[in-house]
Amino acid sequence: MKDVFYLDTNIDTTTSTGDGIATLDLSSYVDPIARGRAKGTGLAIYKVHFDICDDDGNSPVAAATTGTFRAGIISLSGAPAAAVGSASLSSNVLNASNDLMIAGVDFYAGGTAAGDPAPHVFLEPSIEVPYVVVRDNACLVYDVGDNMTTEHVISIRLECAQITLDQATLNQLLRTQTV
């Protein structure tokens, strides 16, 4: 892989149940319009790294913290940023069967129940098969399933590269990434 670079964003959770969205502007990295001999450009995402920490952005989540959430990065154009309670996700947005889903993670705070698992990444792109975004935005989305006892910061880092796309591939990706 050459010309790989990193993009990142984060979002603060709250303690109440509900959905939240942070928008990552990708418009300077994608150009879904082929002009003459110039081919369209997409953003290939090879890896997604999730980090979940205390609300100070530095400390690990305290062991006594309780609650659960699911988070993911989605190729979605037009979703406004929204805090918990002001966003409402449709059914089947944060799961592996959603074609717009790039990567996702489940988080179970350590004090919720004995033997709670560590954060579980349930979907991610790969170096061999990257997720190619051709829309202007990606959204970091989360759903607090069980009230959290403390607030947290969900951060992501994307390993990505700009790639050129032939017309057939570009058309297929545009169809797939249309809501």
Give the predicted meaning of each segment.
Residues 4, 12-13, 31-41, 86-105:
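Extracellular distal adhesion/interaction modules in secreted or cell-surface proteins
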Residues 77-132:
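Extended, solvent-exposed segments with strong compositional bias
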